[in-house]
């Protein structure tokens, strides 16, 4: 899902979140067709970044949306001094970040698709290979 603003003072207001969810759904329907429906929501910065989300979580659920967070990352938004500079480094960054988490039976990788993230696109086939070699399966979120 997309978002247009971060929540002021890291306090999320459910009305703003629901409006954002509706705007996002409408934008996606314009591109993908009126039949499009997502069942997933990712808070900007992740669920762990905000306070007072219980009401918003409930309202999102009423809209048929479940929130999800990432539990590992490829490092493409990290400070330049620690950001991977090649494909192998990108895969290693994911492996290291995944090893920090206690729950690794499901991996949700944070990656960005901005114009400046060429390495992310270049590394994607190797990232997929890495997860397949580790026995992960790929599926569709709806």
Residue map of PLM features:
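Metal-dependent polysaccharide deacetylase catalytic core of the NodB/CE4 family, i.e.
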Residues: 1-85, 102-111
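Aromatic/hydrophobic pocket-lining residues that form the small-molecule binding cavity
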Residues: 17, 21, 90, 120, ...
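A generic secondary-structure signal
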Residues: 27-31, 93-97, 130
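Glycine-rich loops and low-complexity Gly/Arg-rich segments
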Residues: 64-68, 92-95, 133-137
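Catalytic cysteine-centered active loop of the rhodanese-like fold, especially the PTP/DSP P-loop
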Residues: 100, 110-115, 119
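C-terminal domain-boundary segment and adjacent tail
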Residues: 116-142
């Amino acid at each position: 899902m997309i978002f247009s603003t971060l929540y002021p003072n890291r306090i999320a207001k459910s009305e703003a979140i629901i409006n954002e969810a509706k705007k996002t759904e409408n934008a996606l329907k314009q591109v993908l067709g009126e039949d499009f429906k997502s069942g997933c929501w990712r808070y900007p910065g992740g669920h762990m970044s905000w306070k007072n989300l219980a009401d918003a979580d409930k309202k999102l659920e009423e809209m048929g949306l479940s929130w999800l967070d990432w539990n590992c990352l490829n490092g493409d938004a990290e400070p330049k001094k620690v950001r991977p500079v090649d494909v192998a480094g990108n895969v290693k960054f994911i492996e290291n970040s995944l090893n920090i988490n206690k729950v690794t039976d499901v991996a949700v990788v944070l990656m960005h698709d901005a114009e400046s993230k060429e390495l992310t696109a270049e590394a994607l086939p190797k990232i997929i290979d890495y997860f397949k070699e580790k026995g992960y399966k790929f599926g569709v979120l709806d």
